[in-house]
Amino acid sequence: MRQRAVRNLARLGTAHARITRILDAAAGGKNNFLADRDLVRHFDQVTPVATTAARAVLEYLSRVIGHLAAVEGVDQFMIVGSGVPNGPSGGSRLHEVARLTSPGPDVRVVYVESDPMALTLAQATIEPFCDLVRVVDGDVREMDEMLGDPVVQTFLDWDRPIAVLLLSAHSLDDECARTVVKRLRHAVPEGSFLGLLHITFDGVPGELAPAVRGMLAMTLPGLNVRTRAEVADLLDGLDLLEPGLVWVPEWRPDGGDPACADAPSSSGNYGAVARIP
């Protein structure tokens, strides 16, 4: 498996930047290419928000996973739309955060990704080295196929709580996004959790909006940016953990020097975690 993944990685085109690697490049990680780093540098010439926002997003995801593992006792995670998954410091991984914060030794993580470049990179750099991690080719817009994937069905225990982190709602139109959230909340076992990350232009200064829109248009085809009210609508009826739907730096900050703490809206992303009854 490792040799095949590495061969596939070698055949990938790397001339164009993609958001799944830009996030890593902006956070100082190693799972990116020159095109991604060039775009981050170009964007930082306009505003330094790219690097700090990337840090804020990764720190949020790390806190969510850490809380669910350490406090809620979750030992199964499905991370949907993960790109090349990282933790808050360059090169660290979200499944490592789960393992380090869980009181148990057998935390299982399934990454689901549809972008072929991100998928192959993750398969080459994660699966060969981690027995309790799987990387699955899946598209949240094809819910039956994603949930019915043999790895998803057998690697995770669907009789026990699962934490699903939905990181790609920005790729869905309103009707599809509502359907996906509804399907996920009814598919997972009782006592599971649904975490959400969603990009927004709320709080983006008017003079920076064209640059932000331009970068995102280059890297996120089919982008659906939502306001706080629109994101809240996706979560309607769900029991949100405190502090509810907030800017990602505001979700259970744990001290230290969190990115975007002085201006949470500069993170450009909302986050929330819901308990599934």
Predicted segments with their positions:
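Short alpha-helix
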Residues: P221-L245
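A short, conserved alpha-helix within the catalytic core of class I
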Residues: M143-G148, S171-R183
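Short SAM/SAH-binding signature in class I
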Residues: L156-H170
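Short "lid" loop at the C-terminus of a central beta-strand within the Rossmann-like core
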Residues: A169-L172, I199-G203
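Conserved beta-strand signature within the Rossmann-like core of class I S-adenosyl-L-methionine
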Residues: A163-L166, A187-I199
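Short, glycine-/aromatic-enriched active-site segment of Class I SAM-dependent methyltransferases
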Residues: P205-T219
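Rossmann-like AdoMet
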Residues: M1-G138, E142-W158, R185, G268
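Core SAM-dependent methyltransferase catalytic element
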Residues: G244, E250-P277
